[in-house]
A protein has these predicted regions:
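Active-site-proximal helix/loop segments of hydrolytic enzymes
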Residues: 1-120
Length: 120
C-alpha cells in the first residue's frame, strides 16, 4: 500500500530490549541498504540525539537482513528503536506522555526537515 503513494516514506517504530544487560539505552535508527534510506536514517538519528539525549553516541546502522518488511519495501524506509525497555530508567521514561510527545515531535521534525515540501 505505501508503495502506491508518490514520494512515500516508511517509518517503522519500535522499542528495543537487550536482556544480557540493563545498561544499554538510547534511540537508534536502522535502514535498509539504499542511499535514500541511509540518508534519512542518519538525519533522523541526529535529530533524535539533539532532541532527546545529546550524550547518545549511537549511529544510524544498516539492518541485518532479518526484517521482512524492510527487505521488501521499495520506497525509503527506516526502523526507529525509540529506547530500551530492558533499561528500567528508560522504560519508565518511555511510558510518560511528556516523553512520548517529545519523541514524536523529534521524529516529525526529522521527517519534515528531510523531505522537500510540495510546492503550493
Amino acid at each position: 500500500m505505501v508503495e502506491s503513494i508518490p514520494n512515500a516514506l516508511l517509518v517503522s517504530i519500535h522499542q528495543n530490549t537487550y536482556t544480557v544487560s540493563r545498561r544499554y539505552h538510547g534511540a537508534q535508527v536502522f535502514y535498509e541498504d539504499e542511499v535514500s534510506s541511509r540518508q534519512l536514517a542518519e538525519h533522523a538519528q541526529e535529530i533524535l540525539r539533539q532532541s532527546l539525549d545529546p550524550a547518545n553516541t549511537r549511529q544510524a546502522a544498516k539492518l541485518p537482513g532479518t526484517v521482512y518488511l524492510m527487505e521488501h519495501i521499495t520506497c525509503p524506509a527506516i526502523l526507529v528503536e525509540c529506547g530500551f525497555l530492558s533499561n528500567p530508567e528508560e522504560d519508565a521514561l518511555l511510558r510518560t506522555a511528556a516523553y512520548q510527545t517529545k519523541l514524536a515531535a523529534a521524529l516529525a521534525s526529522a521527517l519534515l526537515s528531510h523531505v522537500p515540501m510540495a510546492e503550493e
